[in-house]
């Protein structure tokens, strides 16, 4: 697996380690209207599914998008992908907003679901890299516009880490902190 996506997979596993299905329903105590741990992960899973659809569409056409990034999209790409800053307080687009939880999942189940999506994304990114190279902005993100394969990987990492910080904060607030910090080695 590509080192960027592998790092994300390890960080997800660390963040969810040892949580049972009731613990994944915890929210920030001071902000009970915010998503639960499971809903945060479901948001990420919806994001991965959307990315899979976007990449599959371009791979099926065997042609990159003709879209060009707008000035706001250029700024968003620079801020998020180059600087690694994900803005706080933005409302998620409807297509990646999790529904109310109907089936409780434990941390291990959420980790497995994420690992499956990330493995699929890794295969799609590898295929896109082979077909389009690393610099061609071949597929468009709904907010950031056209991205190249490494930008797609980096987006997933930065977006994921943004939400994993929220999960770790919820765990800490409920005295459920994981034992060790993950290393950022490949």
What are these regions (language model features)?
Residues 1-186:
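Aromatic-glycine hotspot motif
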């Amino acid at each position: 697996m590509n080192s960027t996506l592998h790092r994300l997979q390890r960080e997800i596993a660390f963040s969810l380690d040892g949580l049972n299905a009731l613990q994944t329903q915890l929210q920030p105590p001071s902000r009970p209207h915010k998503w639960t741990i499971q809903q945060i992960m479901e948001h990420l899973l919806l994001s991965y599914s959307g990315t899979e659809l976007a990449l599959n569409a371009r791979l099926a056409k065997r042609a990159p998008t003709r879209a060009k990034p707008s000035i706001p999209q250029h700024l968003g790409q620079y801020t998020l992908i180059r600087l690694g800053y994900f803005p706080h307080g933005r409302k998620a687009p409807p297509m990646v907003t999790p529904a109310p939880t109907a089936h409780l999942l434990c941390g291990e189940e959420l980790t497995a679901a994420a690992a499956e999506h990330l493995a699929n994304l890794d295969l799609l990114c590898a295929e896109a890299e082979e077909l389009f190279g690393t610099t061609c902005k071949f597929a468009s993100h709904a907010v950031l516009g056209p991205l190249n394969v490494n930008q797609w990987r980096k987006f997933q990492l930065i977006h994921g880490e943004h939400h994993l910080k929220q999960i770790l904060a919820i765990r800490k607030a409920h005295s459920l902190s994981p034992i060790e910090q993950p290393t950022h080695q490949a």
